[in-house]
């Protein structure tokens, strides 16, 4: 039995829950972080010294960093499911996972925090505008790629779609004006046909 430590409204936890349900893995989850706290306790820091979520416990072993957890689960539990079948496609999936962490995530994070987790009277409009512009610029890169591919690695859904798919839900559900990105929108709607996406990602932003 897998144990996942982390609150459901964390985008990084959502990645792990989504992949678990896609692979039909049994797990237990404990609310950690955010308003639930406990992520700075000595017990938790012994497992994840960053004090962040999620943390995965598998047979007494611990693993942190959400994208590493996603890769581990796909490689160890279901080698012919969400894991592409050739080294090039695996590398492409990893490329887009890394891009989510280094480019898309940092762009959308200030926008999300100001619009969702900050009282209206305390919101920084300049940060919101800059975040919207940076996120849109990043998503244009993905939109251009998806104009030639149904999913990030080609014609088949893979673990590479999961991190960017979580970010896409936030983008399409924030109260902002969005430029038309038709290939991105088509890909997003394909993701919404996945029950695991609806169950673990498509929730009220908080």
Q: Predicted segments — roles?
A:
Residues 24-26, 140, 182, 206:
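Compositionally biased amphipathic helical and low-complexity segments enriched in hydrophobic
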Residues 25, 42, 70, 149, ...:
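Intrinsically disordered, low-complexity segments enriched in small/polar residues
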Residues 1-9, 14-129, 143:
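GST-like domain detector, emphasizing the conserved glutathione-binding G-site
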Residues 199-206:
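Short, flexible loop/turn segments with low-complexity composition
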Residues 50, 76, 148-149, 194:
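Structured helix-beta-strand junction loops
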Residues 34-35, 160, 205:
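Conserved beta-strand edge residues that scaffold enzyme active sites
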Residues 88, 100-193, 200:
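GST-like fold's C-terminal all-alpha helical module
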